[in-house]
Amino acid sequence: MQLLDIHKRVVTLEDTRELKVPQPNRVHIVLSRVKGSKNKDTEGMSDADAIDLIKRITPDAIIGGEISNKNAAAIWALMGSGHDNCMATIHAESPEAAYEAFIKCIMEQSPHINVEKTMQEMHRKLHVVQIVRDGNIRGITCIT
């Protein structure tokens, strides 16, 4: 986030507020995975509602939290909405495994997607930055 221009409008979408965004023009949307959350501003808001809200805000950058079975289809839709800077995280052993994990998560909400077409589209649209941690040190080991 430090690499983004300080004047950019940044929107974050997380299930737990963890990201620290230095840009003053920012909006944090927190959607809890737990019913009865203390976050009254987004209580009852679905992932699809959040995606619609984010599109209306017209951010310069969208930073999602961790991709999960619940939010993957919505995040994929958002990544295809024409916003240039969209980032999220997913746990995987390799870049190819990250693509596969993303598709598996999308299929939880959208089981009838064309897997081959979606995989090709992901390879065309997404860059995977693989980060490995060794103790307290993190390093980039691959960029696709």
Residue positions per predicted region:
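Conserved P-loop NTPase
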Residues: 122-144
